[in-house]
Amino acid sequence: MTKGQTSKMEARKKKGKAAAAQRRQRPLPAGWIQGDFLPSTVTEGDLLELVEHGLLAHKSWRLPADNEVEPAPREGGRVLLLSHVHRGFSLPPHPFFKGIMIHFGAELHHFPPNAIAHLSAFIVLCECFIGCPPHWGLFKHIFSARSQTIKRLSQSDDKTHLLQLCGGLGFQKKSWSSYPALQLSESVRNWQSTWFYCQDIACPNASTGLPPFSLDRPAPPKQLALSKAEKNDIQPLVEALVDVVRRGGGHRY
């Protein structure tokens, strides 16, 4: 990249950050409730950085229009979130993550950033430390599924069982698991405003990567219970996990 091109890119980044700062100061959209999308604050500079680091395909992305308050992708387009890409998600999705979405009937935005961090770490644990493909039984041994319902606006309101549109599904480490605890932020502020558009990239032997986008809320999650056969099947993997932690190789992934 020439010096002139670098200067132009830096100027675009600076202009984009100023515009994003203005958008963050806008009032919440009418009718907004906890867990809904927020108007996007993503800038061209944000996405150029992802391209530069190999996290986003060149010319595959599109910024939302200034007047968009929630995503509405074009044909073949999908909705990605910076918060999720920064925690390990990319297109095409890892086959294990695609299986997770199918199991829960979920979309990318149904999972909060910390759930993506847990999934990324688990995949790395299996592939790089234990030496096996991500194993569904081991995942169920380690994690339980959790849900996040819409918060009441006041104490007098009836309790709702509706799950949040963004971040309604998550994972929590089971107390008895030897899986090392990850140091994660308790919450990622305004991550629902980090969305942008990207062309879908299909998984191997599949017609799509991410499912088509919708504004449907997630369904209450199925519990991650192990059958007796699964418990026997994963015993060698559990022993391998304990060994990884004992050797100190499992606390920084």
Residue map of PLM features:
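Residue-register detector that marks a fixed positional context within folded domains
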Residues: 1-253
